[in-house]
């Protein structure tokens, strides 16, 4: 669904005034201004006012707002479940209750000016296709537009998004157009929605947004050459007969030569399908590889718990405990062993958090080879 003129429906709680538009001023009323009762496009309050109005309408229908993700609404009944996801004025409705979905669409039509776009094929730049294997998400058109804009549509493809063991630094000749670099990295960052294979490269390149150098630009071009090789690559979601949650966690150690911080990474699978992933530099310096891996495990557990809570809230049964895989034996021992010692006592908070989830039976750990 698409809501027409969505922001104009929002009710303003603040006092906001505007000048009268040209040609609207009546004789003798020059100098008067209008007080807004509804939000307008361009007001900083408009998105919040619109979301509040839309939330009230859904709650009136009987939908509940998810506590784990406020952009997700759900309703459970004897006929099944209805799920609604909203991003500003773009809406996706799905579920196992066809009659309920039809009733919800009719209800929204009475509240707002809506347009039913039919079966989901395109949403926020993400292309959705269906086959016997499952649902496939990609951003092929987005990639091709990006390559054309960057002048790389005819570029020679390469096999990796970043040169192996590449060490970027802040030193070097600055880019002639840093704004162009920032725009490119911003667009690549949005592409990671369906391309986890470039998540690490984009994470590294985004650390040099303030003063990008020519070396940084060349590294960004490497990502474009990699995308040229497979612009339609994406993620397939299929039915594999189970709903187990698995998470793979990893980290390097002191990988950044400038501040010696480590980079964490994880990917979360539900029912054999990849649903969440991230690559990010850690906030503190780790004193050992085990500590770096353990901090990555703590971040992974946070994401696993969030996924579990969201699925449980909307009525999707998942198998517990979730499995957390790591390739560092020392980090796994820290997670399962309640004993503190000199090398781990300063990461006490992370220790308590991960161990608590293990003791509660929500998480089990396992070793996987590098």
Which role fits each region the language model picked out?
Residues 2, 18, 42, 54, ...:
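Mobile genetic element proteins and their domesticated derivatives, centered on retroelements
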Residues 56-60, 99-110, 174, 190, ...:
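Alpha-helical coiled-coil heptad-repeat oligomerization segments
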Residues 1-3, 244-257:
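Two-metal-ion RNase H-like nuclease active-site motif
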Residues 65-68, 93-138, 143, 318-321:
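Polymerase palm active-site segment centered on the conserved acidic dipeptide of motif C
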Residues 226-251, 316-318:
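Structured nucleic-acid-interacting core domains from mobile-element enzymes and related host factors
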Residues 1-113:
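Metal/cofactor- and membrane transport-associated sequence elements
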Residues 40, 88, 116-234, 369:
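C-terminal reverse transcriptase regions that engage the nucleic-acid substrate
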Residues 122, 244, 262, 274, ...:
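RNase H-like nuclease module associated with reverse transcription
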